[in-house]
């Protein structure tokens, strides 16, 4: 079973109903799988911090939601997480493809991507890096359980050892 199939299963098993996303090459197969599955309502957002608002509204309306994006985009959410989600106890799950580390060719991805776990720690958003494709479903379920039981955001960073990496065009 691929990491994508496992992630979809983990989302379903934890009653995630809404997916907010920004397209990216690496996360696109997961986004497409969610869009093709009737279990999810998908919402394309123009900026990642808008997803925090969409998912906060979903929670207030009785739905659980998840954000799918890449790590450089996740950095755009920090103000919304710090000023809305954290103080108002509005949970969501982030499934984020990690850029800026192993296999990275784009220097612009390194600044926030390489340091993303520490940056999330600095804004008090719990996070976990997933390095092994074999346990994606379990990690998604565990992260969602933590996020929704504690009413706080939780981010899973999907490492390139799971997702593969984006190769430089020549």
Residue spans of the language-model regions?
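Thiamine diphosphate
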Residues: 1-170
